[in-house]
Structure formats: structure tokens, C-alpha cells
Design a protein with these regions (language model features):
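Residues at alpha-helix boundaries and short interhelical turns
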Residues: 54, 86, 103, 159-162
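Alpha-helical oligomerization segments
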Residues: 141-147, 153-186
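Structural detector for internal amphipathic alpha-helices that build alpha-solenoid repeat scaffolds
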Residues: 2-7, 28-38, 49, 58-72, ...
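N-terminal acidic leader/helix
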Residues: 16-23, 118, 122-129
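Amphipathic alpha-helical scaffolding segments comprising HEAT/armadillo-like alpha-solenoid repeats
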Residues: 2-19, 38-51, 72-85, 105-118, ...
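Short inter-helical turns and helix N-cap capping residues of alpha-solenoid HEAT/ARM repeat scaffolds
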Residues: 23-24, 55-56, 87-88, 120-121
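General structural signal for alpha-helix termini and helix-helix connectors
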Residues: 53, 119, 134-137, 157
Length: 186
């Protein structure tokens, strides 16, 4: 793509991001749909931060569909950067749900999902379990090591964690062990 083409696309993306902030539901939904066609990964972080503030169910649904439709593996970095940010802690469940609903493989982030499950509440652990169950691999040995450390820390520092969360963490530990055993077979 020419420099002018990239510049034109960036201007279009910036305009669509401005339209999202308009407060007009029709305009916001049209802008989200425009980002599906004209957007690039630079729009993901501001869009995720906007989603955190959304109270309109139509806009929320449109954003859920937008993130579930992602196919570009390069989008993973921006989404994980927002997901791991403590400022979105109360919003992580939606981001995690969008991750397991999309077609992008997040296998490179196995350890981060295990850590989020260990450090978060029951619903975060449930969403992380679903993400982990849907990972395709392959995995680096370091992912297993970091996952085991997160699981060990969870067991050592577990306070009054619910029985349900403890069960989820047990399931995650079994999956990680199975993934590691299958990894060792190659």
C-alpha cells in the first residue's frame, strides 16, 4: 500500500473513532461497522477502552460481534495489552469472552490466561478456562513453566477462594499438564 493509501486509511480510522465517541447510537454502530471494513489494529485499543464505558445494549452487542469477527493474528498483541492492564480488571470478562469467540489463536498467551485465572475471580477463571480449552498450540516450553508457577502461586496464596473456582483451577491444571505431556511427545 502506498504511503498516501496508508495515510488515507489512518485518517478514515481516526474519523471512525471520533464518530464512536459521538453518543449517537446510529452513528456509533455505523462507525463500528466501518472499522470492520476500514480499520486496522491501531483502532483496537481505543475501541476496547470505549467498550468498557458502553451502557447501550445495541452498541455492546455490536462491539461483541466486532471482536468475535476478528481474524488478523496481529490483533492479539493489542487485545492482550489491554486485557493485562489493571485498569480494565472489571471489564476483563467481556474481553475474555470475545477472545474465545473469535477465530484468532492465542496459544502464545497460555501462561497469561492461567495467571489471569489464578489471580481473578470465579468468572474470570471460567472465561480463561474456556479460552485455554480452545487454544490450538503449538506451545513454547516457557509457557508451561510460567503456567505451573501461576498454578503453584494460586495454591500457596489461596485465601477463601470458592470451591467452584478451586474446581476450575484444578481443571486448568489438568489441561495444562495434558498440553505439556502432548507437547513432550513431539
Amino acid at each position: 500500500m502506498s504511503t498516501t493509501g496508508k495515510s488515507g486509511q489512518n485518517i478514515k480510522v481516526q474519523q471512525l473513532l471520533l464518530d464512536i465517541q459521538s453518543g449517537d447510537t446510529t452513528k456509533v454502530i455505523k462507525a463500528i461497522r466501518g472499522l470492520e471494513s476500514h480499520g486496522n489494529n491501531s483502532a483496537l485499543e481505543p475501541l476496547l477502552h470505549f467498550w468498557k464505558t458502553v451502557t447501550n445494549s445495541d452498541i455492546d452487542r455490536e462491539l461483541s460481534e466486532f471482536f468475535a469477527a476478528l481474524k488478523d493474528t496481529d490483533s492479539r498483541h493489542e487485545i492482550m495489552e489491554v486485557l493485562l492492564n489493571e485498569e480494565v480488571e472489571d471489564f476483563r470478562i467481556k474481553i475474555l469472552a470475545s477472545i474465545w469467540n473469535c477465530k484468532v489463536d492465542y496459544s502464545d498467551y497460555l501462561a497469561q490466561f492461567v495467571t489471569l485465572a489464578a489471580e481473578g475471580g470465579f468468572m474470570e477463571a471460567l472465561e480463561c478456562l474456556t479460552v485455554i480449552e480452545n487454544l490450538d498450540g503449538p506451545y513454547e516450553e516457557e509457557q508451561f513453566f510460567e503456567s505451573q508457577i501461576a498454578l503453584k502461586n494460586y495454591l500457596e496464596n489461596r485465601k477463601s477462594s470458592t470451591d467452584e473456582k478451586a474446581q476450575l483451577m484444578s481443571e486448568i491444571a489438568i489441561i495444562v499438564k495434558d498440553l505439556e505431556d502432548n507437547h513432550d511427545d513431539f
